[in-house]
């Protein structure tokens, strides 16, 4: 499902309609704020593989220059960006076919990007959760764990039941949440019997 997410200036104290920030890319698939306090616009400008970021803590500066750290990159992937999750000194970027990391390295390139997993794409923009063990996420036919370096398939006793019961025409509605006090991650999904 295509989304249209814009970077907006919103205050909880004002009863005003959120408006797009000047110079920020429009028609994004999603947003994430990195540990280094940059806003990543995912699928920026309607390009499903592009990530743009503003200058550090300056949501109005999106044009790269030698005097700032704004930038952009088109991921080398056949997939489309689905979600990004801040984790352990890096940002995990999940497409529908693979996984990448963005690590801050400073000027002139600002971020370094690396593919850390193949055949591990996610099916939803809300299916990943960062925990103290890493990022857990759901894919087309498996659950995965990004441990900070690589993506691993998770063995699961209820794998066949869950993946046999998911309504695949509604899988973009799957979402996850962590329950840290029990060391658990839960996924909520539309079942095969749902409309």
What is each of the regions a protein language model found here?
Residues 7, 41-42, 53, 101, ...:
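Hydrophobic side chains in beta-strands
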Residues 1-37, 43-45, 68:
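Disordered, low-complexity "stalk" and linker segments at domain junctions of extracellular
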Residues 29-63, 77:
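Carboxylate/His-rich catalytic cores and anion/metal-binding grooves
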Residues 37, 77-195:
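Beta-sheet-dominated scaffold domains
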Residues 11-16, 60-67, 107-113, 152-154:
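Beta-strand initiation motifs
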Residues 19, 24, 63, 69, ...:
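Intrinsic-disorder/low-complexity coil detector
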Residues 1, 52-54, 155, 163:
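Short Trp-Ser/Thr-centered turn/loop motifs at beta-strand boundaries
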């Amino acid at each position: 499902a295509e989304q249209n997410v814009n970077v907006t200036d919103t205050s909880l104290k004002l009863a005003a309609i959120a408006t797009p920030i000047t110079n920020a890319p429009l028609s994004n698939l999603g947003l994430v704020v990195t540990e280094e306090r940059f806003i990543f616009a995912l699928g920026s400008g309607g390009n499903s593989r592009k990530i743009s970021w503003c200058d550090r803590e300056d949501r109005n500066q999106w044009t790269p220059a030698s005097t700032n750290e704004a930038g952009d990159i088109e991921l080398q992937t056949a997939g489309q960006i689905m979600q990004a999750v801040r984790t352990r000194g890096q940002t995990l970027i999940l497409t529908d076919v693979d996984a990448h990391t963005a690590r801050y390295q400073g000027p002139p390139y600002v971020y370094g990007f690396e593919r850390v997993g193949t055949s591990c794409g996610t099916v939803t923009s809300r299916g990943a959760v960062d925990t103290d063990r890493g990022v857990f996420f759901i894919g087309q036919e498996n659950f995965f764990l990004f441990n900070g370096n690589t993506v691993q398939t998770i063995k699961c006793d209820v794998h066949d039941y869950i993946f046999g019961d998911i309504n695949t025409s509604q899988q973009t509605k799957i979402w996850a949440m962590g329950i840290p006090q029990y060391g658990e991650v839960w996924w909520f999904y539309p079942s095969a019997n749902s409309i």
